[in-house]
């Protein structure tokens, strides 16, 4: 089993909502090819770390507003952008994200990410082909 599947199974069994963050989010979106020894997730559950097949699964508690009401893909995109940081988001990254998401996922992102930081939302608008004002 892959680490992401194990993390999702743990989250299900504990009734946590989880979203990949850090390099894990970048890997899952194809923005990084770096193999990570630690798979990181934000969670509405407690801080927890699990060791599994020489891989570490790390769950970091976050407030619900970073997780609740957001689809998996919207949360994943937001976490990836936050990991990169505003100054590291290039046109190439926006293009990669745009190609990775379906039209439905893009529409969900636009609707759901309105509460995120201004630069994150502006980036999502560009990714979805919206105007950038």
Which ranges hold each PLM region?
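A short, charged helix-loop
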Residues: 51-61
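Short beta-edge/loop segments at beta->alpha junctions of small alpha/beta modules
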Residues: 1-10
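Generic, low-specificity signal for short hydrophobic/alpha-helical stretches with a mild N-terminal bias
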Residues: 7-8, 32, 59, 63, ...
């Amino acid at each position: 089993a892959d680490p992401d599947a194990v993390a999702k199974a743990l989250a299900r069994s504990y009734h946590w909502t989880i979203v990949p963050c850090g390099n894990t989010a970048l890997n899952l979106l194809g923005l990084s090819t770096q193999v990570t020894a630690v798979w990181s997730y934000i969670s509405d559950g407690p801080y927890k770390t699990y060791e599994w097949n020489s891989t570490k699964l790390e769950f970091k508690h976050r407030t619900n507003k970073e997780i609740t009401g957001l689809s998996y893909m919207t949360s994943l995109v937001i976490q990836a952008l936050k990991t990169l940081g505003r100054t590291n988001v290039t046109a190439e990254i926006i293009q990669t994200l745009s190609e990775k998401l379906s039209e439905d996922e893009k529409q969900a992102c636009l609707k759901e990410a309105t509460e995120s930081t201004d630069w994150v939302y502006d980036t999502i608008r560009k990714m979805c082909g919206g105007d950038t004002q």
